[in-house]
Amino acid sequence: MGFTADQEALVNSSWESFKQNLPGYSVFFYTTILEKAPAAKGMFSFLKDSAGVQDSPQLQAHAEKVFGMVRDSAVQLRATGEVVLGDATLGSIHIQKGVVDPHFVVVKEALLKTIKEAVGDKWSEELSTSWEVAYDGLASAIKKAMS
């Protein structure tokens, strides 16, 4: 069974909830990543020289890009059943930063935790699954571009 219209709608509506507090959820997202993988701090240019996760335009822009790409992946999965990267350099950037498979798991967990925080009592298993499938599609496309 492919990605459904309901799943796409769930991702889109929760994406809007995320964007309503982009500064707060961006900090939450990167704080969650660094709690699970402190060594990943150096992979992010906007974090590597800071004492901790602090709000900045670069942090917000990167978080919005990550979550936006997952949202776009949901749209692509619904329309075509596959994710095609809009930025051909994503594979080489991830290689350059030293990204390996476990990092994708950490980011996925942080993404889900952030969306759960953003939607509050609207969180459901179906919402979680929708984001997981969309993220997995994006991660797969990035990994393919890395090989």
From Swiss-Prot:
The modification Phosphoserine is found at S45. Heme b binds at S45, K65, H94, K97. Keywords: Cytoplasm, Heme, Iron, Metal-binding, Nitration, Nitrogen fixation, Nodulation, Nucleus, Oxygen transport, Phosphoprotein, Transport. The keyword Zinc does not apply. Root nodules. Monomer. This is Leghemoglobin.
